Curated annotation (Swiss-Prot):
Enzyme class: transferase
Keyword Metal-binding among record annotations: yes
Any one biological process term the GO annotation gives: pantothenate biosynthetic process
Pfam families: Pantoate_transf (PF02548)
Organism of provenance: Dehalococcoides mccartyi (strain CBDB1)
Primary localisation category: cytoplasm
This protein's name: 3-methyl-2-oxobutanoate hydroxymethyltransferase
Length: 279
């Protein structure tokens, strides 16, 4: 049985931290289930860490549905949350509802995530009113990276901090079940967390959030060119995979792989008969 929205809210009430990770494929989803991760985010971050885009802006509904379906097939226990891509909910509450519905009906997600605060509250309410759980996302919102002039810490001034607090309260009022707080001062995240009844999930927002989410490629060390400040590397998969692939290539080149152990053989009698037929 999958984690429920109510269970996540109970975790906040009981001061039990919520660990969330992204996943984009079947085997990763299986591993996260096995490790006991209660919720999986199929993030539009896949645009950058899987598809090689410069930002998340280029990600489409089709991209998301393709990866979402794979994650759903691989997971049996985690709550699956799907990111709504850029321009799939911005035009109207009806557009937002239709696309959110696709993630639930076609993709098999249990919830969707939208970026924005006051400006998307009407979309959140419309989706929630139709029975689809919504996670909010404020602070650094990657889909607005061009407007924000890059991936920068948000809420560092009094005005912007107050604006983010207003965003959080608007999302709670609209019916969001949780809110991602991304790349903001830890003190501000703590104030927001204490001021709302729904769970806050931090990414670069300090330790006082009700839970944390990380991009799995970052925390597993898949890339060497960039490591976000908010990420702790729990493995060096880039190094491990590079070493393994190099060893494989070297063994193939010198004829050390495959050996008899990795090969299949014919019955001796069949082999003898075969040789008579072809030699």
């Amino acid at each position: 049985m999958r984690t429920t929205i109510s269970q996540l809210k109970e975790m906040k009430q009981n001061k039990q931290k919520i660990a969330i990770l992204t996943a984009y494929d079947y085997p990763t989803a299986q591993i996260l289930d096995k490790a006991g991760i209660p919720a999986i985010l199929v993030g539009d971050s896949l645009g950058m860490v899987v598809l090689g885009y410069d930002s998340t802006v280029s990600v489409t509904m089709e991209d998301m549905l393709h990866h979402l379906k794979a994650v759903v097939r691989g997971s049996q226990k985690a709550l699956i949350i799907a990111d709504m891509p850029f321009m799939t909910y911005h035009l109207s509450p009806e557009q937002a509802l239709l696309n959110a519905g696709r993630f639930i009906q076609e993709g098999g997600a249990q919830a969707v995530k939208l970026e924005g605060g006051v400006n998307v509250a009407d979309k959140v309410k419309r989706i929630v009113d139709c029975g689809i759980p919504v996670m909010g996302h404020i602070g650094l919102t990657p889909q607005s990276v061009n407007q924000l002039s890059g991936f920068k810490v948000q809420g560092k001034t009094l005005a912007t901090a107050l604006s983010l607090i207003e965003d959080a309260k608007a999302l709670e009022k609209a019916g969001a079940f949780a809110i991602v707080l991304e790349t903001m001062p830890a003190e501000l995240a703590a104030i927001i967390t204490a001021g709302i009844s729904i769970p806050t999930i931090g990414i670069g927002a300090g330790e006082e959030c009700d839970g944390q989410v990380q991009v799995i490629s970052d925390m597993l060390g898949m890339f060497t060119d960039f490591v976000p400040k908010h990420t702790k590397r729990y493995a060096d998969l880039n190094g491990s995979i590079t070493k393994a692939v190099s060893e494989y290539a070297a063994e193939v080149t010198k004829g050390a792989f495959p050996t008899l152990k990795e090969s299949f053989t014919l019955d001796k009698k069949v082999l003898e008969e075969l040789k008579k037929c072809v030699l």
